[in-house]
Amino acid sequence: LSLHDALPISRRLALMNLAIRGFEADLGSEHADTFRRDLHPDLRADYVLANPPFNDSDWFRKDDDPRWRYGVPPKGNANFAWVQHFIHHLAPHGMAGFVLANGSMSSNQSGEGDIRRALIETDLVDCMVALPGQLFYSTQIPVCLWFLAKSKHADAKRGFRDRRKETLFVDARKLGTLIDRVHRELTDA
């Protein structure tokens, strides 16, 4: 288990949370900005799960970063920097699941559409789930789940059928129940 956070308080909370649950993890020797200094440059993960900051406009970008294999992300929005960072750290059969703002599914500003197209054309996108707004306490914007797979070949050991050239789209925007004026909760029903 490896984690990375730029904020010292978030890093300490993650360490405490992991310790309480009995998990061991490599959080690096200190907090660091993922885009300025990747603490795990050689990490290739089987699974990546993430909830990066949505639409972050205040991020560091180096145009020649090797992680930008599918296109240089725009300076004003880190969404596709995060996506490519996750892909960069996947093992050859690795999978990633993460949440982003819904705009990440349709934005065409500053090359974002080209990056998204490249991800689809290289068959990395396994599933997209559009969710309703008001799921987070920190923002009311609608969000989506991205699921990426480095390999969509059949894998009996993992219980996967051949999914090459297939992408599942799920429209879940109408799901959930408002629990108060500004918060929605997804339920089993």
Residue ranges and their predicted role:
Residues L1, A14, G22, M95-G97:
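Intrinsic structural disorder
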